[in-house]
């Protein structure tokens, strides 16, 4: 007899034994089918046929387990996996073989997850699991036959149990664990029956699979999955019954699916998810609950999955994490409730999904998040109610969507749940949905709840894509204001671009080439470059106090010169702060032309038009918010007041007291007329108002007592202080002469002068209380006399005037009248760093005879503390900026070079200023260098004669 015939006979005998054992097992389980077993031997024994220990396909036992791997044959073979130890779980991952056989191998462990791949045949195959037993469990594979076989798990018992599967009949096929493939795997349940429950999963295909839960009956439920298809999947939930129920969620698919969850039952409920697929899965165990709680890890698809465990609840709670698909999925379980709570997270599709379950309520609630599709979806939980609540959340479509309440049966991808309660009173159900929030589909981010609105961004300008002239400006402390701008002239736009380039380029102090300026002009307008350059130069001179001069006519290079120079200045437009003061004059002009008040949004629009609000903010202005709300307001150039009866609150700008003092409306009107290329009389109302103010000022100058915001009595009373009758001034009637000695009065006056000079750099008003705190409270009786003495010293010695800034608050400030020729042209400035040694180098070259060897200049810098490597950087920068030029020394071997003054140095400073600088450093007089002094005098005379012929860009206006 051949070996094949012997093996066939042995298999037939094993199949016959398994059939006999299966019939006896059916008779034994039939009485207990309708409900739970009467006796529970222990905590490790399954509590019912719907226990997760049976449904997961593995049996826990206290003793050792034995696994026998069958030999593959031509016919279908069946393998029964052995039991494992306590607290161990196993998931079977099948592999495909050529023969029709199924093999499951479980490795026993103590708390670890074991996966054994069974062999899947092309034909029908059978996979049977064993029930848990307290004793030794022995598993033996049956004999395969040519017919399909059916395996039935054994009944758990206290002793040793042996499970032999019977021979399969010609009836329906059994459960096969799916093979993980590139697509998501799916398990499908069968219809309900009165027999024991046998989960039979199908072979996974690359396409979509279908999950159909069984219809529960009064007996034990049996789930038999149908064949997976690539079409549309529709899971149908079972009806509620009094016995235990089994719920299995649908698996992910690439198509759209409709899922209807089962209604909640009065008994215990256990939920199970399918086996993991190819992707990674992360599951967090559930927290402890007062009742029985079962948590099953989700099935991982191709994308990562994150499952958050449910919070403890008062009753029985079953939490089933989602089954991730190709996209990212995040599931947040429900919060604790007093009653029974069942939460089933969504089944994500290809796109990311974010699900937030409802807040806790007093009654029992069932919450089902939406099923994610290709797009992203964000669902917001409702507010908690007193009674049972029902939360219906939408499914995510292909585009970003917001959370709305869909009607059941509208179409696929609709998931809804009913309220689970004992009385099932629909009138007590409340549905509360907050305002929907739309999320971006391009951002893959996990969110556990709705995020708050973004905080206001100061000085933010938002432009509408559909309407280019419509912008939204966020001011200092106001909400967003929508403004419709007038269309900008293309010529003015080119002028603004060129203006921005000139200001930024000037920070580096490098000469500006004409070719570089042409690059910032649109090609269609480059033929009008002279007109654009003329307008930009006019803006530079009027607003920023810079003069555009031609440095080299042959190379066509230009530089910017600060116009705050050699002539005495009067008023605000000639102040040393330069560009900031020019910007302030624009703000004052806007306020004056707008009716002596301007809203914050209008000021922001004007600054935006000037380029201050762009992303490339100029360091020449610093922080625009600080410039408006801190510097100009604190210095009392501007007043910042809220608009009355306006919601939301808006603010307006007005002229401050310092602006009324340091300038006039006529000067501001002429300045604005120069900017807009108009005549001051083009604004007749403002022009008449400015004339009336000038007449009032002229009339007030003839009186000793001046009105508000005018120069006080200090200017007129300063000459009377020296005479014995000086106390006959405005204070003679109020305050009697004091008995203080003259020396003490002079000492207090000098201290007061030091205070004013110290506070002059901050431009902050000095109140009377602060002055008395500094010089002493005892000086309050002689305070007017001390002010007169200090005003006389400041006027005659320092060239400044002490004026009353605010008579009501008794605050004072200095009005500076110093001439710019008394200060150096080239000084250290935060806007022009790197000039710390420029005046030293230029003075050294002039003292050395207008030229100095390169080695001598480096030795001079080394004497000033400059490091060896940095002296080369300093001289190279001055050479490139044309402050100095390098000439080769004739007949020098090796070749040597000497430095001389460059064209920029001759424009920005003079030899007399350099000589005075050296004399101040060495504590000498300029005449101590007679040769250099005579040369400096001749240079001053030549500058006076040819000053109007120095490299000007002609015909600006």
From Swiss-Prot:
Assembly state and interactors?
A: Interacts with DTNA. Interacts with TRIM28.
GO CC list: dendrite; nucleus; perinuclear region of cytoplasm; plasma membrane; postsynaptic membrane
Enumerate the UniProt keywords alphabetically. Answer: Cell membrane, Cytoplasm, Membrane, Nucleus, Repeat, Tumor antigen, Ubl conjugation pathway
Pfam families in the cross-refs: MAGE (PF01454)
Q: Where is the composition biased (Polar residues)?
A: 85-96, 104-130, 158-177, 220-232, 256-306, 328-344, 364-380, 414-428
Localisation: Cytoplasm, Perinuclear region; Nucleus; Cell membrane
Region named Interaction with DTNA: 743-957
Composition bias, Low complexity: 138-156
On whether Membrane is a keyword of this UniProt record, the answer is yes
Annotated spans, Disordered: 1-433
* GO biological-process terms attached to the record: negative regulation of transcription by RNA polymerase II
Occurrences of domain MAGE (ranges): 491-690, 745-936
Going by the entry's taxonomy, the superkingdom of the source organism is recorded as Eukaryota
Protein's UniProt name: Melanoma-associated antigen E1
What function does this protein fulfil? Answer: May enhance ubiquitin ligase activity of RING-type zinc finger-containing E3 ubiquitin-protein ligases. Proposed to act through recruitment and/or stabilization of the Ubl-conjugating enzyme (E2) at the E3:substrate complex.
């Amino acid at each position: 007899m051949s070996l094949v015939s012997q093996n066939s006979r042995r298999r037939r005998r094993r199949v016959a034994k398994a059939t006999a054992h299966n019939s006896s097992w059916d008779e034994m389980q039939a009485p207990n089918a309708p409900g739970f077993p009467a006796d529970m031997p222990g905590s490790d024994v399954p509590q019912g046929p719907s226990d997760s220990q049976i449904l997961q396909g593995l049996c826990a036992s206290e003793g050792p387990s034995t696994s026998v791997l069958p030999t593959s044959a031509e016919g279908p073979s069946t393998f029964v996996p052995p039991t494992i130890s306590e607290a161990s779980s196993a998931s079977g991952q099948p592999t495909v073989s050529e023969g029709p056989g199924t093999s499951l191998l479980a490795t026993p462990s103590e708390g670890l997850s074991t996966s054994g791949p069974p062999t899947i045949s092309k034909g029908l195959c059978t996979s049977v699991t064993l029930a848990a037993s307290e004793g030794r469990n022995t598993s033996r594979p049956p004999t395969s036959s040519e017919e399909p076989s059916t395996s039935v798990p054994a009944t758990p018992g206290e002793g040793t149990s042996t499970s032999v599967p019977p021979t399969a009949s010609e009836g329906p096929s059994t459960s096969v664990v799916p093979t993980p493939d590139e697509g998501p795997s799916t398990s499908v349940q069968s219809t309900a029956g009165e027999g024991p429950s046998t989960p039979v999963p199908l072979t996974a295909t690359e396409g979509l699979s279908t999950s159909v839960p069984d219809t529960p009956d009064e007996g034990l439920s049996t789930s038999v999955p149908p064949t997976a298809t690539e079409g549309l999947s529709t899971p149908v939930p079972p009806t509620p019954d009094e016995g235990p129920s089994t719920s299995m969620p649908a698996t992910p698919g690439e198509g759209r699916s409709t899922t209807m969850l089962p209604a909640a039952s009065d008994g215990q409920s256990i939920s199970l998810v399918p086996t993991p697929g190819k992707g990674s899965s992360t599951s967090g165990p559930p927290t402890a609950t007062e009742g029985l709680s079962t948590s099953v890890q989700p099935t991982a698809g191709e994308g990562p999955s994150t499952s958050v465990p449910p919070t403890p609840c008062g009753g029985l709670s079953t939490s089933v994490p989602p089954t991730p698909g190709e996209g990212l999925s995040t599931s947040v379980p429900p919060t604790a409730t007093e009653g029974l709570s069942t939460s089933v997270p969504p089944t994500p599709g290809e796109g990311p999904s974010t699900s937030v379950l409802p807040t806790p309520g007093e009654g029992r609630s069932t919450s089902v998040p939406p099923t994610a599709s290709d797009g992203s979806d964000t669902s917001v939980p409702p507010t908690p109610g007193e009674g049972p609540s029902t939360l219906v959340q939408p499914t995510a479509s292909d585009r970003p969507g917001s959370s709305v309440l869909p009607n059941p049966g509208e179409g696929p991808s609709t998931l809804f749940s009913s309220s689970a309660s004992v009385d099932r009173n629909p009138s007590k159900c409340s549905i509360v949905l907050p305002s929907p929030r739309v999320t971006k589909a391009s951002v893959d981010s996990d969110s556990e709840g709705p995020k708050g609105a973004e905080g206001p961004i100061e000085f933010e300008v938002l432009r509408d894509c559909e309407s280019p002239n419509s912008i939204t400006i966020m001011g200092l402390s106001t909400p967003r204001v929508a403004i419709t701008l007038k269309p900008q002239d293309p010529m003015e736009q080119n002028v603004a671009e060129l203006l921005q380039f000139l200001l930024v380029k000037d920070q580096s102090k490098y000469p500006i080439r004409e070719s570089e300026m042409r690059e910032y002009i649109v090609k269609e307008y480059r033929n009008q470059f002279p007109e654009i350059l003329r307008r930009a130069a006019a803006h530079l001179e009027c607003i920023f106090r810079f003069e555009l001069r031609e440095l080299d006519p042959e190379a066509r290079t230009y530089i910017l010169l600060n116009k705050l120079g050699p002539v005495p200045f009067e008023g605000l437009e000639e102040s040393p702060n330069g560009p900031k003061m020019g910007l302030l004059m624009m703000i004052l002009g806007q306020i004056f032309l707008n009716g002596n008040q301007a809203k914050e949004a209008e000021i922001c629009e004007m600054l935006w038009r000037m380029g201050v609000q762009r992303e490339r903010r100029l360091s020449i202005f610093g922080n625009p918010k600080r410039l408006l709300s801190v510097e100009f307001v604190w210095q009392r150039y501007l007043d910042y007041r809220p608009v009355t009866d306006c919601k939301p609150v808006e603010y307006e700008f007005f002229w401050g007291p310092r602006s009324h003092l340091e300038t006039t409306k006529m000067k501001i009107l002429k300045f604005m007329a120069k900017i807009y290329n108009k005549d001051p009389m083009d604004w007749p109302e403002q022009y008449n108002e400015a004339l009336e103010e000038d007449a009032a000022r002229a009339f007030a100058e003839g009186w000793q007592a001046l009105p508000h915001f005018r120069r006080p009595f200090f200017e007129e009373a300063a000459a009377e202080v020296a005479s014995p009758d000086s106390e006959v001034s405005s204070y003679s009637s109020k305050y009697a002469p004091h008995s203080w000695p003259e020396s003490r009065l002079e000492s207090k006056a000098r201290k007061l002068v030091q205070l004013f000079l110290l506070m002059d750099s901050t431009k902050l008003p000095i109140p009377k209380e602060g002055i008395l705190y500094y010089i002493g409270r005892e000086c309050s009786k002689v305070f007017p006399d001390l002010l007169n003495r200090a005003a006389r010293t400041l006027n005659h010695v320092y060239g400044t005037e002490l004026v009353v800034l605010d008579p009501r608050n008794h605050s004072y400030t200095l009005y500076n009248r110093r001439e710019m020729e008394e200060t150096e042209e080239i000084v250290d400035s935060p806007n022009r760093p790197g000039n710390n040694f420029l005046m030293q180098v230029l003075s050294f070259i002039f003292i050395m005879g207008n030229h100095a060897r390169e080695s001598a200049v480096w030795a001079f810098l080394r004497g000033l503390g400059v490091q060896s490597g940095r002296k080369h950087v300093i001289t190279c920068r001055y050479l490139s900026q044309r402050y100095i030029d390098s000439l080769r020394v004739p007949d020098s071997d090796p070749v040597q070079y000497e430095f001389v003054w460059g064209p920029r140095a001759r424009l920005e400073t003079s030899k007399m200023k350099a000589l005075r600088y050296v004399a101040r450093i060495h504590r000498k007089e300029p005449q101590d260098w007679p040769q250099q002094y005579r040369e400096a005098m001749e240079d001053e005379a030549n500058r006076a004669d040819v000053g109007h012929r120095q490299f000007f860009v002609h015909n600006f206006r």
